[in-house]
Amino acid sequence: MFESEAELRRIRIALVWIAVFLLFGACGNQDTIIETDNGNSDYETPQPTSFPLEHNHFGVMEDGYIKIYEYNESRNEVKLKKEYADDELE
């Protein structure tokens, strides 16, 4: 009986050592990268601008063009209806 208790104690100690090793091993391998935007960026990606229109239509202004789309609710699809250059509307 004493032999089995000693064996269980050794197993318990081994499990504690494995847990401690895994805990500190996992904590030591974390690399943290922090990116900050300081506002000195010369390049900005152009963002499309959308605006609602009447009767399931909407417009998207992108790269100097205005595109008019129609949304069909029954088929859940969007269809390009017209496209204008930005300077045509002035």
Swiss-Prot record:
Pfam families: YmzC. Residues 1-26 form the signal peptide. It comes from the Bacteria. Keywords: Signal. This is Uncharacterized protein YmzC. The lineage of its organism: Bacteria, Bacillati, Bacillota, Bacilli, Bacillales.
